[in-house]
Amino acid sequence: MAASVCRPYVRSLPGVMPWRSSSCHYEYTAMHHFLGSFQKLPFEPFNTGARKIHTAPVRSLFLLRPVPILLATGGGYAGYRQYEKYRDQKLEKLGLEIPPKLASHWEVALYKSVPTRLLSRAWGRLNQVELPYWLRRPVYSLYIWTFGVNMTEAAVEDLHHYRNLSEFFRRKLKPQARPVCGLHSVISPSDGKILTFGQVKNCEVEQVKGVTYSLESFLGPRTYTEDLSFPPASSRDSFRNQLVTREGNELYHCVIYLAPGDYHCFHSPTDWTVSHRRHFPGSLMSVNPGMARWIKELFCHNERVVLSGDWKHGFFSLTAVGATNVGSIRIYFDQDLHTNSPRYSKGSYNDLSFVTHANKEGIPMRKGEHLGEFNLGSTIVLIFEAPKDFNFRLKAGQKIRFGEALGSL
């Protein structure tokens, strides 16, 4: 019965052999050719009368469509950001502190895996390439327009004078452009933006509001106290107490961020004596305020140069922190310092004492004296000891210029 029903349909298929007498063999041969025809012929739409239903390969169902996925991802992220904004507004109305949104360990590790040291070295080499005379003005003008550089303050305003980007970044200022305040004991060592300032509490320094880093991790262990004019504290004292050498004093800090358009040199913030230099090879992550709010202990991860010594009120230190494309930190009186060098490995530090048999005090620095320079914008961190009545004359987030007062007694 099955053979008689299928015979009219199967005979019409091309390539089907004549039927044999055996019904079993007949059914097998017909069905074999019936199925084999689908491998030879392209798929045709089945006509169902009013409409056609087209078949498609199964693999096309699994093809990723980037535009809808990107739109869905972007919409989800935008919605999440709106939720965070709404939540922060609610917390602000209730008078509650908004918790900082810190990067996770894997996010920090992923960022540190980017070869920023190698990229910064390549950027440094590029900065040394001499530009053709006709190209200098358009290149420097674009940089001036992008970062808001005030060239009227430069000692040389002619853009053709600067042979390469490095010379332009390290341009000198006119003497009258940055008058040094003589009334206050501590001045700003550079142009920039005040991120944080205040007392150091519980051996933690404020990176930005709500985000801190370890004082000991930042400065390193006190293994060089024999070079300074005061003895080390006992081991049972906290690290902070080891730095505070006089009774009744407190430890203070101030963080200044230098943007790419700022004056890149830094100066002595007070009259003091530099006794020791410690160089920490490290990462070169961005140190802009947004990253400082996102990555905890950012300054401890990055390459930095710590200059420490003492001033009239006790311990004083200035730390130059490197950043992306700012692997070059130069200290004018330290010819042995070579930052972002492949011979140094992360996680170590290199010490140099300026106290010798011939010079038992170190290197004296006068307030406002040239101290060093960055290749591009970065960060300066001051940590110093002062009496309890020391007052900062600052506001968080304010712009400041070299020579202006930071605080006074």
UniProtKB/Swiss-Prot annotation:
It is an enzyme of class 4 (lyase). It comes from the Eukaryota. It catalyses: a 1,2-diacyl-sn-glycero-3-phospho-L-serine + H(+) = a 1,2-diacyl-sn-glycero-3-phosphoethanolamine + CO2. Its main location: mitochondrion. Keywords: Cytoplasm, Decarboxylase, Lipid biosynthesis, Lipid droplet, Lipid metabolism, Lyase, Membrane, Mitochondrion, Mitochondrion inner membrane, Phospholipid biosynthesis, Phospholipid metabolism, Pyruvate, Transit peptide, Transmembrane, Transmembrane helix, Zymogen. The keyword Phosphoprotein does not apply. The modification Pyruvic acid (Ser) is found at residue 378. It holds the Pfam family PS_Dcarbxylase. The active site is at 191 (charge relay system), 267 (charge relay system), 378 (charge relay system), 378 (schiff-base intermediate with substrate). Residues 1-52 form a transit peptide. InterPro entries: PS_Dcarbxylase, PSD-B, PSD_type1_euk. Heterodimer of a large membrane-associated beta subunit and a small pyruvoyl-containing alpha subunit. Belongs to the phosphatidylserine decarboxylase family. PSD-B subfamily. Eukaryotic type I sub-subfamily. This is Phosphatidylserine decarboxylase proenzyme, mitochondrial. It comes from Cricetulus griseus (Chinese hamster).
